[in-house]
Design a protein with these regions (language model features):
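NTP/phosphate- and nucleic-acid-binding module
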Residues: 1-479
């Protein structure tokens, strides 16, 4: 029990050391564990349950827009990977290779997939024939390996779980529309499931995906006011189709190259959730992705009728299609309260002998700590409303953090002072030159996050060169 108690209590305050606070929550809330291979992580049952909820919601969104799931091989022949020069150049430092099959050296090295554009293109080269088969709207849920130098749970690891969507289209216009649709899908998911506001925008040429004509992104602000790229959507034009000889017979009976997209989001979303909502008592989860949405804690459970009453509450809540846990263990109520705060359970329902006499229960919110006494007859409606309130409050607090820490600045010195001080997002004008983008990194210590889709259209000056320009851009220190 003493060991369990330490698990509940030992969290470094975020104000003291944000990075240590984050790692403490990942470990103490039993989301992950470190693997024997450096840079790899074990997703523990509670952490994987969050990922399953993300998958379930997001997969439903994909299917509503006509996407189907497939599974591609984990290994890619080196010759196949090299067909698209920009892609292999972009990922070369991160690729892990298989050189042996059993005790025999392979004739050709095989790459563990860092991403799967090559495998999808190879497949489409073999199966696509006519424009009548288009569009092909594919998605896969899998893990990929990228040999990152610096790793942190959920944010950067050498193996991570994700979904990667890959589509091909008859026209460029259809492919561009797909790219924009999936970006909006990610933004909607973050708002509706994670209670997390994001900035939607386009990456600069320097920051775009290797081989893409355009990359779109959603950028979120964490509690330490750093940026976290939380999902990307790429438009490739017909570049990959040409590299991999993917063709179809068009409406004019001539061979044509389809236009391609890809888009992805990862277990990084769990890290985003932690750093957007959690506090010094542990994990705080929005109800939509919480493995347990309501925990029922009996008070003085050894007394007659208490466990029966708690089980009755559990049954009623489960009938609402909620994820519910009844903790009837021998731990003290105080330990249980701290444990489920650590686990980020949105609502805690308490019932004891006095509550039974009054035909009520006590409901505590994880986000605010507020307690409400609710008549047992009103349980369902109260819980339903409180779960909505938790989501809305989490979103409102995250939105306030984003709005209060986004600054309209005009010089690189102002951006530097912001980055070295409080932190946040700097919104400036930008002339569009790579030189000025690199200078912002060198002088101000920030990277370009995105050019927001909603542009103001006003004229201003580039913070580096002073040229008049109209493009709005966000800068920040990023994970």
């Amino acid at each position: 029990m003493a060991k369990d108690q330490r698990n509940v209590e030992a969290i470094t305050p975020m104000e003291m050391d944000f990075a240590k606070w984050y790692t403490d929550i990942c470990l103490k809330a039993e989301l992950v564990d470190y693997a024997s291979v450096k840079g790899f992580m074990i997703l523990r049952p509670y952490g994987y349950a969050i990922w399953e909820n993300i998958q379930r919601i997001m997969d439903g969104m994909f299917k509503k827009t006509g996407h189907v799931n497939v599974a591609m091989p984990v290994l890619i022949p080196e010759s196949l990977l090299k067909k698209e020069g920009e892609l292999v150049e972009g990922f070369a430092p991160e690729v892990a290779w298989v050189t042996m099959g059993g005790s025999e050296k392979l004739e050709e090295r095989l790459a563990f997939r860092p991403t799967s554009e090559t495998m999808f293109c190879d497949h489409w080269h073999n199966v696509l024939q006519s424009y009548r088969e288009l569009p092909m709207l594919y998605n896969q849920w899998c893990s990929v390996i990228r040999w990152e130098k610096t790793t942190r749970p959920f944010l950067r690891s050498r193996e991570f779980w994700w979904q990667e969507g890959h589509t091909i289209h008859e026209t460029a216009e259809e492919a561009i529309a797909e790219t924009e649709q999936q970006l909006n899908c990610y933004a909607d998911f973050c708002r509706d499931a994670l209670a997390m506001p994001v900035v939607k925008g386009r990456k600069t040429d320097k920051e775009k995906f290797a081989g893409a004509e355009a990359t779109y992104t959603i950028e979120a602000m964490m509690k330490d006011r750093k940026a976290l790229q939380s999902g990307t959507s790429h438009y490739f034009g017909d570049k990959f189709s040409r590299a991999y000889d993917v063709t179809f017979t068009g409406r004019d009976n001539k061979l044509q190259y389809p236009f391609q997209t890809s888009w992805g989001s990862t277990t990084r979303l769990i890290g985003a959730c932690i750093m957007t909502h959690s506090d010094n008592n542990g994990l705080v989860l929005p109800p939509a992705v919480a493995p347990v949405q309501v925990v029922v804690v009996p008070i003085a459970q050894h007394k007659p009728g208490v466990l029966d009453a708690a089980n009755a509450l559990k049954s009623r809540l489960e009938a609402m299609d909620l994820r519910v846990k009844l903790d009837d263990s021998e731990q003290s109520p105080g330990w249980k309260f701290a444990q489920y705060e650590m686990k980020g359970v949105p609502l805690r329902v308490e019932i004891g002998p006095k509550d039974m006499e009054k035909q009520q229960c006590c409901i505590a919110r994880r986000d605010t700590g507020e307690k409400t006494f609710v008549p047992l007859a009103d349980l369902e409606s109260a819980v339903q409303q409180l779960l909505r309130d938790v989501h809305d409050n989490l979103y409102a607090m995250a939105e306030k953090n984003l709005e209060d820490n986004t600054f309209d600045l005009t010089t690189w010195e102002e951006v530097r002072d912001m980055a070295q001080g409080r932190g946040g997002f700097a919104r400036t004008k930008w002339c569009g030159s790579l030189e000025c983008e690199l200078a912002m990194k060198e002088k101000a210590g920030v990277s370009s996050r995105c050019m927001p889709l909603k542009q103001s259209g006003t004229v201003g000056k580039c913070p580096v060169c002073g040229k008049e320009c109209t493009t709005d851009i966000y800068w920040g220190v990023a994970y």
